[in-house]
């Protein structure tokens, strides 16, 4: 299914104060410090998702249209009607982040960006580096020093300038911001930029194309929450254009020790303790997601839920998955 090249007129709107402004990859935060969302100027009845980019083909690496597999063993184990997994790991760079990277780098290309700074826990950095290479851009990717070597090597293979930063994930963000200011380079943050989340909407359309309106629940691992936000926005469009009648419940899964979204939804006070927080789920080890409120709103409006899991549980279910599968 080719869902490319369908754009609409749009503007930025602050999710905190409601201020509207002209869209630009150079605009990451409002004067009130809130993050922007993309709002389209006209309602669309078209089948395709409304997108802020006209030409995806120029940077297309094969992102999207990932397969889904059924797991009868899990259906029996959990006593549920159906259990499916969407295999985002076969995306060009190995993660769902390619959906957002394609949109963000295309937007940057439209504004003649030649060099930029980004930070990541690994997956987004590799993805952004891949699309930057395709676009002929010079990228500086900041990642924690403890990032798995395979991700560091992957970023290097794409030709990016990699910066290894000591300390927790947030330290890489701070270092990237300081570097961009010092060197007068754009900070092209996938966590702050609304373009990145927008690219995730294709995920919803692909599920609808495969299952129509039969999916009742979608479980998503959440660090910054771009996939969950994009999934929610995609389903909003599908409902508005009368292609489906009901939105699936969106469920957020966080790593224990990095669960600010779950904690807030449960009314619990959560304070990040870097000396006592580590997880094998490095891709979602995010202590300060900039779009936390947007993630929570998306979960609530879909009647979903949020939980956190510890490393012991993650390891246990990895083994159980292999046992049930094979």
Predicted regions and their residues:
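PLP-dependent amino-acid enzyme catalytic core
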Residues: 1-326
């Amino acid at each position: 299914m080719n869902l490319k090249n369908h754009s609409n007129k749009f503007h930025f709107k602050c999710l905190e104060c409601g201020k509207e402004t002209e869209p630009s990859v150079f605009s990451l935060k409002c004067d009130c410090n809130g993050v922007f969302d993309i709002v389209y100027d006209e309602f669309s009845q078209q089948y395709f998702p409304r997108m802020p980019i006209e030409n995806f083909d120029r940077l297309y690496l094969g992102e999207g249209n990932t397969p889904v597999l059924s797991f009868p063993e899990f259906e029996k184990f959990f006593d549920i009607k159906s259990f499916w997994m969407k295999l985002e790991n076969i995306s060009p760079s190995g993660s769902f982040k390619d959906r957002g990277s394609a949109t963000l780098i295309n937007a940057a290309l439209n504004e003649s960006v030649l060099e930029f700074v980004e930070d990541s826990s690994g997956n987004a950095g590799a993805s952004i580096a891949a699309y930057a290479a395709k676009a002929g851009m010079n990228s500086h990717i900041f990642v924690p020093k403890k990032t798995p070597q395979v991700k560091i090597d992957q970023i290097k293979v794409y030709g990016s300038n990699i910066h290894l930063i000591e300390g927790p994930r947030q330290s890489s963000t701070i270092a990237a911001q300081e570097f961009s200011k010092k060197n007068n380079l754009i900070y092209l943050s996938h966590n702050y930029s609304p373009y990145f989340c927008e690219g995730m909407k294709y995920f919803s359309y692909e599920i609808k194309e495969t299952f129509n309106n039969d999916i009742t629940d979608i479980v998503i691992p959440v660090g910054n929450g771009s996939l969950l936000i994009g999934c929610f926005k995609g389903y909003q469009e599908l409902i508005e254009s009368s292609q489906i009648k009901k939105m699936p419940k969106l469920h957020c899964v966080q790593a224990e020790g990095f669960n600010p979204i779950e904690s807030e939804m449960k009314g619990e006070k959560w304070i990040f303790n870097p000396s006592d927080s580590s997880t094998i789920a490095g891709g979602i080890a995010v202590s300060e997601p900039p779009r936390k409120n947007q993630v929570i709103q998306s979960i609530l409006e879909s009647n979903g839920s949020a939980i956190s899991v510890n490393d012991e549980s993650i390891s246990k279910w990895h083994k159980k998955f292999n046992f049930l599968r094979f």
